[in-house]
């Protein structure tokens, strides 16, 4: 038995706890956490911009896998810290909870973690180098895995001011260390919209691309950008106010800025920020926005005779087709979770409600035609929702009669043990027929679907439910959709989408994923939705047979089998395989290949669906042209 004494108790010093438990500080050590490192450094530069000391930021992706963030702010202080007895620069990069944010005099508003942020970035980097232009001198210090390897030294003179941070993520910490320029570009564009007049340059030296973002129109311009390709029903509505609020520490100010616009689309798009930090999970500002808008539209609905006395709009009616950007600035933001994805300040709710009620009443009372346009849109949504409810009730009534519940084309499995069962949604009747013969009837069910199904991105809920193929999928899965989703009624443990390996197959796969993403999202979040990977080729070499799943694999086999006589058969569709081959290659759990569909960042997935499935062909073309050379097979 090992001795358990004082020596067994490990004390983590400096940045060791960050390296031991990185997820606690940046959320994950996957793609999301990796990009979070860049956001932390950029957020510090943004705080300088918000304080009025910086109007330019440059982010550069270097060929060696490092990233550099430069600004023209004041430059991090380099003088000796009174408590630590060493340069403030070194303190900021090596001590948690050190930095300008914690002194009320340095920043009135800040979003970046200031010190927590850059010290965490330093801890999780293979190396980091910081240069500061300040007081006529250039200072530099280098760190490796969070530890200084050089002192703070003067390396030259300058007439500039600002900070340059360059770092390379540590492969010992991160599962992948390659930055995705699209993800960074998305965030940098967001910041430029939120801080009007701030110029952000982004250079990707790996792919040789340069972009500049500067938007003097602020969040009004942001709403127009989000609505490109959609038909707007009116001009963007914009409000901005500073509200005095009571807090635990007395009285504070909250700056509330909101821009919104209705379009002819069927989905809502609400993007929210607190101190420029994106609040993916919303918070008190979003809750207040939604409830205040719903209350106001109900008041005006009755005033303009759209609603009877006892009738009302629901929140979902008011938000369909709505695009909104909500940006608040608060002195002491309370973010829930280490990665700051939800705002918790109660006083913000009061500020947003008051600002919205007073400002929107002024706008609506001065523009009755604007109000009527919005109310007409909301009214048609309400009527469609009520029609969809009737259609859902019809689907439910069908469900009661057990023998007519399930679609006629569904070949069900015999097992009632949900977690062991699988539903294959198969493209085409002929492949569906082969799959029915190939399957293991004990635990595998097969539902064939015809050709191209309805595009759910462009369809209203009642139209969706009238579509026979979508209705078949909903009934077979069993959970219901949207607000009626009930996980306990799920009929299968896994849902596997099986389509041809061609463009049409990819299109149907995308449509099906859109259906699950928009209306049965918990199934994706729980990791229950999969994509089957049928082989692209069959190679015959003498008596041996190989199934090949990619062009790269084919090239490897050709090299390996050099000198032998080989026959190569390309499968254009699932229907070209006989049931035995289909079982062996695509359905047998022992030998098949399947990809689990995940939503690491729901917003990114949503953006992809919006581009590929929405109404803007130019965005779709730009996306495809941009990625066609990089990606052999686009898995979405």
Swiss-Prot record:
Site annotation (Interaction with DNA) points to 452, 455
Q: Which InterPro entries match?
A: DNA_gyrase_B_C (IPR002288), GyrB (IPR011557), HATPase_C_sf (IPR036890), Ribosomal_Su5_D2-typ_SF (IPR020568), Ribsml_uS5_D2-typ_fold_subgr (IPR014721), Topo_IIA (IPR001241), Topo_IIA-like_dom_sf (IPR013760), Topo_IIA_B (IPR000565)
Q: Residues that bind Mg(2+) 2, according to the entry?
A: 500, 502
Which reaction is this enzyme known to catalyze?
Answer: ATP-dependent breakage, passage and rejoining of double-stranded DNA
Q: Which Gene3D superfamilies match?
A: 3.30.230.10, 3.40.50.670, Histidine kinase-like ATPase, C-terminal domain
- Which Gene Ontology molecular function entries are recorded, alphabetically? ATP binding; DNA binding; DNA topoisomerase type II (double strand cut, ATP-hydrolyzing) activity; metal ion binding
Q: What is its main location?
A: cytoplasm
Assigned EC number: 5.6.2.2
Alphabetically ordered keywords of this record: ATP-binding, Cytoplasm, DNA-binding, Isomerase, Magnesium, Metal-binding, Nucleotide-binding, Topoisomerase
Query: Which GO annotations describe the biological process of this protein?
Result: DNA topological change; DNA-templated DNA replication
* Start and end residues of each Toprim domain: 421-535
Q: Which Pfam family, any one of them, does this sequence belong to? A: DNA_gyraseB_C
Cofactor(s) listed in the protein's UniProt record:
Mg(2+); Mn(2+); Ca(2+)
Q: Where in the cell is it found?
A: Cytoplasm
Listed GO CC annotations: chromosome; cytoplasm
Q: Where does Mg(2+) 1 bind?
A: 427, 500
Has UniProt tagged this entry with the keyword Iron-sulfur?
no
What does the entry's cofactor note say about binding and number? Binds two Mg(2+) per subunit. The magnesium ions form salt bridges with both the protein and the DNA. Can also accept other divalent metal cations, such as Mn(2+) or Ca(2+).
| Complexes and interactors | Heterotetramer, composed of two GyrA and two GyrB chains. In the heterotetramer, GyrA contains the active site tyrosine that forms a transient covalent intermediate with DNA, while GyrB binds cofactors and catalyzes ATP hydrolysis.
Entry's family note:
Belongs to the type II topoisomerase GyrB family.
Q: Any extra remark in the record?
A: Few gyrases are as efficient as E.coli at forming negative supercoils. Not all organisms have 2 type II topoisomerases; in organisms with a single type II topoisomerase this enzyme also has to decatenate newly replicated chromosomes.
Q: What does this protein do?
A: A type II topoisomerase that negatively supercoils closed circular double-stranded (ds) DNA in an ATP-dependent manner to modulate DNA topology and maintain chromosomes in an underwound state. Negative supercoiling favors strand separation, and DNA replication, transcription, recombination and repair, all of which involve strand separation. Also able to catalyze the interconversion of other topological isomers of dsDNA rings, including catenanes and knotted rings. Type II topoisomerases break and join 2 DNA strands simultaneously in an ATP-dependent manner.
Protein name, as recorded: DNA gyrase subunit B
Q: What is the lineage of its organism?
A: Bacteria, Thermotogati, Thermotogota, Thermotogae, Thermotogales
Q: Which gene encodes it?
A: gyrB
